[in-house]
Amino acid sequence: MSWNDDDVFAGSANNDDVVLMDSWDAEEPIMESWDAEETPAKKETSPKPDSKKNAKKDSKKDKKSSTDQVLLEIDVLDEKTRKELLKKAELESDLNNAAELFGSLGVAEEHPRARALRKEQEVADAMRPAAFTKDTPIESHPLFNGESKKDYQDLRKALATAIVTMNEKSSLNYSSSLAIDLIRDVAKPMSIESIRQSIATLNVLMKDKEREERRARLAKVKGGTATGGAGKKKAKAKTNLGGAFKKDQEFDMGVDTYEDFGDDDFM
């Protein structure tokens, strides 16, 4: 064998060593000791989804679906109601966004729009008339806080309108238990001159009532007059014949007297 053959075998041996080393490296790593247990390879864990992000996405989806539902419902409404609902929905959305923003920032101050809305509601509640009961003192009504002449006139008109309607329920109780005693009680703080003026006013009212009652009474009687009184009737007019026929004139048509005529008159 020549030296060339040695070189050939040496080259092939080197190639075999390279192949063996590559295959050895490709196999599993050698354990440090025979007693060591095999540890399974750790699986690649996928990152857990963020629950907060999912919650925000779900809330946004819910808000979007609710908004779509509102839009579908208001499509059948008129233009004015639709604008009011859209404005209200926009305001609520702004308030919710502001509340979320302030909550995340730790700010507890009230939103300006919410404060303005609350003040408007308070003013509306204050302007709403309170419900009166039997236990409510009547002097607590704003009409009794009058100072000017017009305020007193408004109070008088309101009281007169409210009290006079009680006469329709019971005229007897109205006159005996309410009106007469009320006039006396109201006149107590007045001066003598003011009481005299009140009496004169009542006298004028009394005369007017007498005239009204007389007219009503005469209207029911046929032929009655305001001056002649009720029940008197007008005398019937007699026809004037000019004295041609009188009761005292006597006409004797039953006696035949022909003494004034002679026999020669009929010849």
Curated annotation (Swiss-Prot):
Q: Quote a single Gene Ontology cellular component term.
A: eukaryotic 43S preinitiation complex
Acidic residues composition bias: residue spans: 24-38
- Chain spans, region Disordered: 1-70
- Coiled-coil portions: 192-220
Biased segments, Basic and acidic residues type: 39-66
Q: Where in the cell is it found?
A: Cytoplasm
Gene Ontology MF, one = translation initiation factor activity
Q: Which Gene3D superfamilies match?
A: Eukaryotic translation initiation factor 3 like domains
Under InterPro entries, the record lists: eIF3-like_dom_sf, eIF3j
Annotated GO biological process: formation of cytoplasmic translation initiation complex; maturation of SSU-rRNA from tricistronic rRNA transcript (SSU-rRNA, 5.8S rRNA, LSU-rRNA); nuclear-transcribed mRNA catabolic process, nonsense-mediated decay
> What UniProt keywords apply to this chain's record, in alphabetical order?
Coiled coil, Cytoplasm, Initiation factor, Protein biosynthesis
What the record says about family reads: Belongs to the eIF-3 subunit J family.
Query: What is the recorded function of this protein according to its Swiss-Prot or TrEMBL entry?
Result: Component of the eukaryotic translation initiation factor 3 (eIF-3) complex, which is involved in protein synthesis of a specialized repertoire of mRNAs and, together with other initiation factors, stimulates binding of mRNA and methionyl-tRNAi to the 40S ribosome. The eIF-3 complex specifically targets and initiates translation of a subset of mRNAs involved in cell proliferation.
Query: What interactions and quaternary structure are annotated?
Result: Component of the eukaryotic translation initiation factor 3 (eIF-3) complex.
Q: What is this protein called?
A: Eukaryotic translation initiation factor 3 subunit J
Q: Which gene encodes it?
A: HCR1
